[in-house]
């Protein structure tokens, strides 16, 4: 079986520089106000390099969101409980929902931009594969690899506790609520505590409802 070629050092440097420049611009600009030209200038690379690497501005924002969510992915797959393996499914679900709300709270504007633009799925799975930074043209929020991972994990944990319910749809409902304007406004004004408590209450009610 052939192994994937390692990235060239200059390609790795360019990718890091582009993502770092985007992070810096996001500190003072809304995502939709950031252009590829601005990113290229801040990163010290040509505009064509950004397009070649990420395909579009949406592709760039998607790749950055994957980077920001990677720590949560690693915590779920190989970290300590309750996020990681080893804890009961119920505890893992509640811990994961708390963690998702924290990530959403720290990335409100970026997530809103990706939802607004209908961010498409990169060829990468969100596990750090650099070759998949480019995006397809047409997609939906649920095609985003971060969303797919979150949804799959939530639905799996719910199904393990309640095989009699539609775990996939419930996971969509829980995640969809976190992208709604009232919840994003609450996160911006007051932080994650109130939405987190509400989502935990909903999850407990679902798990404890009579069969």
For every predicted segment, state its role.
Residues 73, 109-115, 186-187:
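Short, hydrophobic secondary-structure boundary micro-motifs
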């Amino acid at each position: 079986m052939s192994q994937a070629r390692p990235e060239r050092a200059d390609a790795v440097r360019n990718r890091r520089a582009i993502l770092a420049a985007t992070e810096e611009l996001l500190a003072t600009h809304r995502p939709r106000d950031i252009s590829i030209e601005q990113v290229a200038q801040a990163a010290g690379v040509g505009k064509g390099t950004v397009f070649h690497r990420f395909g579009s501005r949406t592709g760039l924002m998607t790749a950055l969101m994957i980077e920001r969510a990677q720590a949560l992915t690693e915590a779920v797959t190989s970290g300590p409980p309750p996020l990681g393996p080893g804890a009961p499914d119920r505890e893992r679900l509640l811990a994961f929902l708390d963690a998702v709300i924290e990530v959403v709270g720290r990335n409100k504007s970026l997530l809103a931009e990706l939802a607004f633009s209908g961010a498409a799925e990169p060829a990468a799975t969100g596990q750090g594969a650099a070759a998949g930074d480019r995006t397809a043209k047409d997609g939906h929020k649920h095609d985003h690899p971060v969303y797919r991972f979150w949804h799959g994990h939530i639905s799996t944990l719910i199904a393990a506790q309640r095989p009699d319910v539609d775990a996939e749809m419930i996971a969509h409902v829980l995640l969809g609520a976190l992208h709604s304007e009232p919840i994003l406004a609450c996160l911006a004004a007051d932080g994650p505590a109130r939405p987190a408590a509400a989502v935990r209450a909903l999850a407990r009610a679902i798990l404890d409802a009579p069969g």
